[in-house]
Design a protein with these regions (language model features):
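Generic low-polarity alpha-helical segments
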Residues: 1-3, 199
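Conserved catalytic core of two-metal-ion nucleotidyltransferases
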Residues: 3-72, 81-96, 103
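Small-residue (G/S/T/A) turn/hinge positions that recur once per unit in extracellular repeat modules
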Residues: 75-77
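Conserved nucleotidyltransferase catalytic core and NTase-mimicking acidic/glycine-rich helix/loop elements
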Residues: 80-245
Length: 245
C-alpha cells in the first residue's frame, strides 16, 4: 500500500515494469496469455488492500468467472521485495477461507470437472473439433486435473510457500499418511506428464500441449495411460472428501 497521492505513479511504474518483463518472456518462448491474465494488465496491478478485497469477493461470492480466476491467482508466489506483503495476503486469504469453508467444495467440484483422459474402452479422449481436431490435449485432460486437485487440498491444509504441483503432493503425502501412496503417485505422474509435454514441445517446436497420438510409440502411450490412474484416484479422493456425489 502507498499513500493515495502516490498510487497512480506507483501503479504506472509497475505496469511498465510488467510490460518489459512479459515482452522479454515472450521473446524467449513464453506465449502471451490470450485472455490477458498477465502482470501487464492494469486490472491485476493492485495494492495489498485491493488484493485482499479481491480475494474476499472471489471466496464469498463464487461464480464460473471467479472460479477460473481463483485457479490462476491462488498460485501466487514471492519473487522480490517485502515478504510481509505475501504473508499478509496469505493471512487474509486463509482467514476468509476459515469463515467460508464451502469454498473448498466449490474448488473441489471445479477440480473434477474434467473426466478421465481415457474413454470407456481405454482409448484416449481427443479434441472433437477446431484446429487441434483428433489431437490429445495433455494440459487440459492430464495436467490441469492434478494442478487443481493439489491446489484445493493445499489450501485446505493451509500450506504456504509451496506453489509447484509436485511439491504440493509431496507435502500432502507427509501430512496424510493414509493417502500417502495416492499423493506420491500424483507427484510422480505430474512430473512424468510435464516431462512428456516438454519433450513433445521440443520435438515439434511448439508448446507441446496438443499431441498427435499417431506419432507416439506403443511404449509412450502406455506410459501416458499409467499416469492417468493417478488422476482417477485423486478425483475420487476429492469426490469423497468434499461430498461431491
Amino acid at each position: 500500500n502507498v499513500p493515495e497521492e502516490e498510487y497512480e505513479a506507483t501503479q504506472a511504474y509497475f505496469i511498465k515494469l510488467a510490460r518489459i518483463t512479459t515482452r522479454a518472456m515472450h521473446k524467449v518462448g513464453y506465449a502471451y496469455c490470450p485472455a490477458d491474465m498477465m502482470a501487464s494488465n492494469p486490472r491485476w496491478c493492485q495494492s495489498l488492500s485491493e488484493w485482499k478485497k479481491q480475494y474476499h469477493i472471489w471466496i464469498t461470492d463464487p461464480s464460473p468467472e471467479t472460479q477460473l480466476l481463483s485457479a490462476i491467482f491462488f498460485d501466487y508466489s514471492y519473487v522480490f521485495g517485502d515478504t510481509q506483503l505475501v504473508t499478509k495476503l496469505s493471512d487474509s486469504i486463509l482467514d476468509t477461507l476459515d469463515a467460508n469453508p464451502m469454498f473448498y467444495r466449490v474448488m473441489a467440484k471445479d477440480a473434477i470437472r474434467s473426466p478421465s483422459p481415457l474413454g470407456f474402452f481405454r482409448q484416449f479422449l481427443v479434441e472433437e473439433g477446431g484446429d487441434h481436431k483428433d489431437f490429445f490435449d495433455i494440459k487440459a485432460r492430464a495436467l490441469m486435473p492434478l494442478i487443481d486437485a493439489a491446489r484445493v487440498l493445499s489450501l485446505n491444509h493451509k500450506l504456504r510457500n509451496i506453489n509447484n504441483t509436485a511439491g504440493r503432493f509431496e507435502r500432502l503425502a507427509e501430512l496424510e499418511q493414509n493417502n500417502k501412496e495416492i499423493y506420491e503417485n500424483c507427484s510422480y505422474a505430474f512430473k512424468a506428464l510435464l516431462k512428456f509435454r516438454t519433450k513433445q514441445g521440443i520435438l515439434h517446436d511448439d508448446s507441446g500441449r496438443f499431441i498427435e497420438l499417431a506419432t507416439l510409440s506403443k511404449a509412450e502411450k502406455l506410459k501416458l495411460k499409467r499416469c492417468f490412474k493417478s488422476i482417477h484416484d485423486i478425483q475420487e479422493l476429492l469426490t469423497l472428501r468434499y461430498n461431491l456425489k
